[in-house]
Every structure is written in structure tokens, then in C-alpha cells.
Amino acid sequence: MRAWICLAPLALAACSGTYEPTPLTDKQAAKMDKALAGLVPGDKVTCVNREPQTNFTVISGNTLLYKVSRKLIYKNELIGSCNGLARGDTMIVRTFGSQYCRGDITSSADLTIGIPTGNCALGDFIPYRQPAP
């Protein structure tokens, strides 16, 4: 009986899956390349300030760009996938405080019919900046 109790966590771990993001299509990759052209990636950060008048740009159901200025754009790979975002659904982010942080719950919804279409969480933010002259 003890052997079964010891093996139960291993059996449950074997059932868990890993998340593989959907690769970008050629059109999505071109959109991201155009937005990040001339910018250099930096080290990942877990939180960024919410800036007024800035928006997330949806690249795919699991990739977002957060434009702070022409000189600074953050790339975010979602944890999970909000598939509806790629179709143009509305993104809803639940934040706690004045920052967007890794793990903040994000969902997508089709507001024309009032149905949620996906749930995911924000991942790490990778800053892309203009290189120093």
C-alpha cells in the first residue's frame, strides 16, 4: 500500500503536459519584425509600469507587444494561449497595482456575443530599445 502512495505523485506528474506555443505565421512574424525593426532586446523583467495612452498590440494568441514609446517596446510571451486575440477579440487584463506583471491573468472575449474565448497569463517582458549612438 505504501508503494502506491509513494508512486501516486509520480503518476500525476506524468499526466501533466507542457505548453508549446503555436509558432508565428509568416504574416505575424513580419508584423513583429516591422514593429521591432532597429531595436535591440534587453534582459527580461517581470513587471513594467502601466503607461497612460499605451496599448498592447496583438501579434498572435500568445505574443503581445507593449509600446511605451518609439524607443521602447516590450515583447511578452503569454503563459498559455488566448486564442481569441489572434481573431481580434478584446483583451482583458486583471492587474493588481500600477504595473503589469508576470502572472497577471489575461483573458480574451468576443464582446459582440459576450462569450469569453481564452484565458492565459502575462509572461516575462523583454524590452526592445534603440541602440545607444
Annotate each predicted stretch with a short phrase:
Residues I79-P133:
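Helix-rich interaction surfaces within compact, conserved domain-sized segments
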Residues L12-A14:
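C-terminal motif of bacterial Sec signal peptides marking the signal peptidase cleavage site
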Residues M1-A3:
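Positively charged n-region of N-terminal signal peptides that target proteins for export
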Residues I5-P9:
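Sec-dependent signal peptide hydrophobic core
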Residues S16-K75, P133:
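N-terminal secretory signal peptides
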